[in-house]
């Protein structure tokens, strides 16, 4: 089975006007029937930059009001470009993650090694920004089966306690 096929999609046969409208009218014509707003970019890098820019804007808005920005993150390869751009913004544009709370969306179960989703996110993202480790919540892939239901209920309560999720980044894979 081939993987990472989404990075090989090219838009050479699709006229630009179908994915990059020139004005608000064209945009409304293209999106009026969408139930979920969708943007199409020519490359994964372009899409990653746009998503990271949107996340950074929302983080900064919450910082201005002294509030916490809550996001849920996946593992895998899909978000790596977004993480790379957020790290760049942290290093070059002083984007701070001190007011950010993260909920890791899932974890392997049973976790039989230290190479779970949380470990990968830590290596690929958390270790490169100034997020407080106490603000990172992750499912525990090593708990007993009897404890899973209670843990999941507590995880939901933790999400509610911080006001819900502001931004959820999902993987495609």
Residues covered by each model-derived region:
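Short glycine-rich or small-residue beta-strand-to-loop segments that form or flank ligand, phosphate
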Residues: 70-74, 103
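N-terminal glycine-/serine-/threonine-rich phosphate-binding loop
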Residues: 2-71, 145
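Active-site catalytic pocket residues across diverse enzymes, especially alpha/beta-hydrolases
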Residues: 86-93
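Glycine-rich beta-strand-to-loop/alpha-helix junction loops that act as flexible
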Residues: 73-78, 170-172
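Ligand-binding beta-strand-loop-alpha-helix segment within the catalytic cores
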Residues: 19-35, 95-167
């Amino acid at each position: 089975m081939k993987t990472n096929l989404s990075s090989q999609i090219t838009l050479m046969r699709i006229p630009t006007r179908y994915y990059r409208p020139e004005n608000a009218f064209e945009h409304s014509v293209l999106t009026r029937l969408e139930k979920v707003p969708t943007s199409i970019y020519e490359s994964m890098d372009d899409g990653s930059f746009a998503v990271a820019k949107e996340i950074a804007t929302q983080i900064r808005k919450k910082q201005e009001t002294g509030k916490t920005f809550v996001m849920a993150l996946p593992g895998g390869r899909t978000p790596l470009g977004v993480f790379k751009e957020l790290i760049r913004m942290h290093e070059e544009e002083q984007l701070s993650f001190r007011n950010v709370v993260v909920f890791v969306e899932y974890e392997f179960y049973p976790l039989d090694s230290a190479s779970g989703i949380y470990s990968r996110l830590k290596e690929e993202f958390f270790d490169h920004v100034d997020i407080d480790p106490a603000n990172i919540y992750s499912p525990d892939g090593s708990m007993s089966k009897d404890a899973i239901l209670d843990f999941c209920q507590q995880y939901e309560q933790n999400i509610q306690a911080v006001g819900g999720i502001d931004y959820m980044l999902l993987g495609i894979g």
